[in-house]
Amino acid sequence: MASGRDERPPWRLGRLLLLMCLLLLGSSARAAHIKKAEATTTTTSAGAEAAEGQFDRYYHEEELESALREAAAAGLPGLARLFSIGRSVEGRPLWVLRLTAGLGSLIPEGDAGPDAAGPDAAGPLLPGRPQVKLVGNMHGDETVSRQVLIYLARELAAGYRRGDPRLVRLLNTTDVYLLPSLNPDGFERAREGDCGFGDGGPSGASGRDNSRGRDLNRSFPDQFSTGEPPALDEVPEVRALIEWIRRNKFVLSGNLHGGSVVASYPFDDSPEHKATGIYSKTSDDEVFKYLAKAYASNHPIMKTGEPHCPGDEDETFKDGITNGAHWYDVEGGMQDYNYVWANCFEITLELSCCKYPPASQLRQEWENNRESLITLIEKVHIGVKGFVKDSITGSGLENATISVAGINHNITTGRFGDFYRLLVPGTYNLTVVLTGYMPLTVTNVVVKEGPATEVDFSLRPTVTSVIPDTTEAVSTASTVAIPNILSGTSSSYQPIQPKDFHHHHFPDMEIFLRRFANEYPNITRLYSLGKSVESRELYVMEISDNPGVHEPGEPEFKYIGNMHGNEVVGRELLLNLIEYLCKNFGTDPEVTDLVHNTRIHLMPSMNPDGYEKSQEGDSISVIGRNNSNNFDLNRNFPDQFVQITDPTQPETIAVMSWMKSYPFVLSANLHGGSLVVNYPFDDDEQGLATYSKSPDDAVFQQIALSYSKENSQMFQGRPCKNMYPNEYFPHGITNGASWYNVPGGMQDWNYLQTNCFEVTIELGCVKYPLEKELPNFWEQNRRSLIQFMKQVHQGVRGFVLDATDGRGILNATISVAEINHPVTTYKTGDYWRLLVPGTYKITASARGYNPVTKNVTVKSEGAIQVNFTLVRSSTDSNNESKKGKGASSSTNDASDPTTKEFETLIKDLSAENGLESLMLRSSSNLALALYRYHSYKDLSEFLRGLVMNYPHITNLTNLGQSTEYRHIWSLEISNKPNVSEPEEPKIRFVAGIHGNAPVGTELLLALAEFLCLNYKKNPAVTQLVDRTRIVIVPSLNPDGRERAQEKDCTSKIGQTNARGKDLDTDFTNNASQPETKAIIENLIQKQDFSLSVALDGGSMLVTYPYDKPVQTVENKETLKHLASLYANNHPSMHMGQPSCPNKSDENIPGGVMRGAEWHSHLGSMKDYSVTYGHCPEITVYTSCCYFPSAARLPSLWADNKRSLLSMLVEVHKGVHGFVKDKTGKPISKAVIVLNEGIKVQTKEGGYFHVLLAPGVHNIIAIADGYQQQHSQVFVHHDAASSVVIVFDTDNRIFGLPRELVVTVSGATMSALILTACIIWCICSIKSNRHKDGFHRLRQHHDEYEDEIRMMSTGSKKSLLSHEFQDETDTEEETLYSSKH
């Protein structure tokens, strides 16, 4: 390792000259013990079987590639892959030969060329195979390693072919990479026979260094470095190697050198940088000693520990190994870089005393090192290995951290969740940690000598796991370990500083941003929020270890610069910050930790138009301050105290939409004109310059101080003495309104309308300083910028979960007692709440749940993680009493593995960028559908062609005919298009209701082809087609389409049908047009759809029902949710700025609007669909131009593809259920009423499905002959809620219980019968009097005579002369009669 590591001290040069003399006298004059060792070396190795010619010369550049190809050819097909990881200074390829079994089935034939340095050049990684690399010829004049690795390649390949059990086992289980020459330029300068420094000239002349005179083994980032490493442009070989290491998960490595015979191990240097004698121990010192001994003990000379190299005859190494720094200090070495910044354990191997021995010695050198090299590769299988997987999906988890108790060195899992942790025999406790998952520890893992112990970890996602002890009032909170995030850099390593200091006008800034996005694609994503008034892009650079994705549990941060166009320092600082973060990621621990644990968004310029009008050197003017419409953007936001009457500007709209779309936690708005950090509130109710305190005043002061205290000039508090001599800000911070009143400011809007805490930072007294002053601004602010970002990891963080299914709850509220400022959870239930140290009572609540309160203590460093698990509210638990015995219940049937797999797919596709992965895995060959517009004839042929080519998943039907007798085609795509499957949701896509807007027609044809092309090729598309009934009606108005004219953006020709009727006004119960009747009768009324998407043209937005003017909109929340979903998946629609030529100032918040608010009219298709078809329908306006040129179709498809696919995913959410009676019999045509408004009917088989916005919804189920059922259901944003409703037979009569009705009826009948009996009895008694009494029966003439007599008598006494006849017979009456 001696000269392989460093130039020797001057007093050793004489000894090296002596070595030269010995070579001239003859190479046979060797030490006696070396000769003896050589004599006893086995000569029957497989290396001797190779052709004699392979040892007779060194392979120079023109032969190296051929030699490696020949080595690869010695094995079986599919065993080897040759590729280059980059080029040297002089353009020579840095060849790598990969050897492992099974490559043939995974990669195309042929090898990658010398320029194929990307991650795909080597072919895909293989799960379960640890990666080992051996690197040779790092110093160009140390050549034995170059040759030995070529011989090793031949040995491994040939041994595998001949069936050597050891080598077959090795290549079946290990992924081996051999890099024979890292410094091919130096090798070409070196001279055979030069064992030291040649003629005593500089090392560059000898070939040691690269072509720019850089020692590659002093050019890596170093943890103990006192200076900057060489710029990577100076050492392209090092840059290539670093990038190669980053792209892979190497486990074990050997760095092969020359100049001694010893195995050295980390660390190579120490903080003291003493030349020699300092043992710099790693946390894995025992492992490194084990690996070094494994090599040395199999080397006949190395194992003696006495190499007896000329000039260092007395140098000895116990067991043939040494600690690098103990031997001598090497700063910037490769082996330390591998250990500190990668997963890789690397040792350095000095193979021979002579650096460039004569070729005649090559055979002996190979024999000396063969067994050691193979043994070292085999040692990758010691320790512990296994997989880390998601407990729900079973998929491997990448970048999970594996820690071993008592060893302060972690590794991370590979792409498949696989890990390999090298350990010496012993008993260990292993812990796995990954953001978004519950940590897991396995104790008492026993590692024995020999093969690794296998330990697999199954991590429970925090967003899908039920946390126990939900009723506990006090949380057992744990601090999340985020290394180095809150403490500064943990070592003396000096990060790379930016070098690009000049004023970037818009074209320069655009090039700068694109360059870094291209150079660092693994950690950057460049995107635009929209456009300024003058159509300049509002760029944002995202920097994250997983760009484009919100990682659950990871906070999001933003900086915004150049809001006032003439305040330019913030713009340049953010460009510097981008360069700083990109160049130091992976080398600087502080930057690496920050990027790993934070999603960072940097917006260099919010006002690019104003910047272009500004003038360098400006200190106090307002030229360029405002945007191109002359509005101050920092007075343009809605304000809590003042009504802002100025029109909202495009830049403001774009930024507000952006802030609503991401879960930002912390932000700063960078300004100029003073030197201070000001915090909310910026104004007050009276409009006075007075302290306007926010509820989080203490938090704002803390985060403001975190910036100012790192800027010494700012912290002094007297910023601009010449301009404002009386201005003083204690510690460089101030309340905004206390300084001066600013209504309509951005920082207040952030705090009040989002979860984000924002401050405004004034960066200097001069608004537009001279270019030469920019380096000073960076130096003054660089530490402040980093420290402020770290504040995003303060306070409390965690998840709010549903106790029923463990899912995260969206929009749950986190409130802190005595601080009147709640925050809400993001999609996966994660939240972040900035707080100063102290003890707090924190409550999590959500609609439909019982709140939970916990006491939490916040410390000064690190965020406290506190998870809340909420139980559904008592309205759910009390449903039994409301519903009786036939209660409905929410279920998630996971018994079917395919159902569970599909549910997981829907959740994955619903995640941020989930649809991106679907599209990336899909075929993009859609030229047939998008190179031109389709006439009616072409469209018909195209649809027939799809059916002919994909008959098993397509069915073409004719819904009816147009006025001019053209067919209105309907294409169904599903796995069983001719079979009724009522349990599957149905979605329809319709287009062309206005014939002059045919873009929608072409998009639907492209969608149909996309689905067919990818069926059985893309798993996600296949499952969506298998489980969805997709109906596509591409042209509702074929007659109008035939009359429309291409490239006419405003013409109304073709808008109506052949009779001049706008079909979107004819959807009524008395529809008059044949096209309308066909759609109503054969599409809307006959088929049960869950969702409908109509495509139109003339603007860029989505409208939802109703188009008719109505006072209230039933189910508005769901309808708007569906419209927003489409708009949010469109790259520009959600920005709300269609920028159509005839309406350039049109502002549509979120790109979504109720139809009547945009263009009110009666008889629309969407209104009819909702009212009579019970199907929600949205209308998408795809472009401002009605009929753009065909050349725009590919870009329009690209813009709408994700949104269209999002509808296919969304149709599987909401509520789906099954209605049955107590015997299990399905009940069809039952009415399901949701939220007392929406009504759907159950289909055949009792199934129903309805889309609903996420949240809690009430359900009423009604069926004839059954009791009404009531329930509640919680709808998630990424999954359907499944409901089973069981009906009881309705025993009620006239709305009353049967028992009551029977009782009352019986009582009533009894009363009626009793009454009848009484009446009958009375009548019977009267009848009996006539039968039993004694009296004279009168005749008719007697009665008549009596009447005459009575009427004619003149005396009353005459009446008494006749007896009164009575039927009674009482004694009293008899006496009365006798008396007279």
UniProtKB/Swiss-Prot annotation:
Top EC group: hydrolase
Entry keywords, A to Z: Carboxypeptidase, Cell membrane, Glycoprotein, Hydrolase, Lipoprotein, Membrane, Metal-binding, Metalloprotease, Palmitate, Phosphoprotein, Protease, Repeat, Signal, Transmembrane, Transmembrane helix, Zinc
Region: Disordered, residue numbers: 190-232, 874-899, 1359-1380
Any one GO CC term of the record: extracellular space
EC number annotated for this UniProt entry: 3.4.17.22
Modified sites of kind Phosphoserine: 270, 1358, 1361
Main location group: membrane
Residues in compartment: Cytoplasmic: 1321-1380
pH dependence: Optimum pH is 6.0-6.5.
Domain note: There are 3 carboxypeptidase-like domains. Only the first two domains seem to have kept a catalytic activity.
Name assigned to this protein: Carboxypeptidase D
Organism ancestry: Eukaryota, Metazoa, Chordata, Craniata, Vertebrata
